[in-house]
């Protein structure tokens, strides 16, 4: 799924937007705006298709934007990660250092300054929902956080010779496992529905407490993403 909004500024072509790659519809709604087109899907083939369609219209760069699972144990929900690279199924893919530096600098003097970190990310094909899974990934990679879209965005950006950057907000911290109800409502296309979540809770009502904690984590991540998008827009940091 994709949507185009506004015209961007960039060294490649001032009329071309940056493409924000996300996994979920709400992330895309936050990301899109003047100069930024957003594509989203939870299933990798759908995401690749949406990104390919957006690329056919032209772009000046690709940014992976949205939420992530925490791997580094010291990082709280709502922490923003501006990544230097993503390691995953396609190996290690570096981000554009100058663009990444401008993204990070945009948070100076804002409430986000204390919540933003730089480091590496991990990319996976299936969600890491358990504490042990996250711990193993952290030991293996040293990555601060993990998501399912950044390695795809990075591989395509590299193949096309486009600048690539990443801005991700942590939802579930390293020490928190996700109950099955937390992911039950996510459709392949990146939209959500409530009925599967309710069915999971009916099957296992004891998940409710954990689900409410996840909801609190999600609010923190969403707040950080909204604030980040505003700060990046004000600073002009989304233009390549």
Identify the residue ranges that each predicted region occupies.
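Intrinsically disordered, low-complexity terminal tails and inter-domain linkers enriched
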Residues: 3-14
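Glycine-rich phosphate- or other oxyanion-binding loops that anchor nucleotides, phosphorylated ligands
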Residues: 13-240
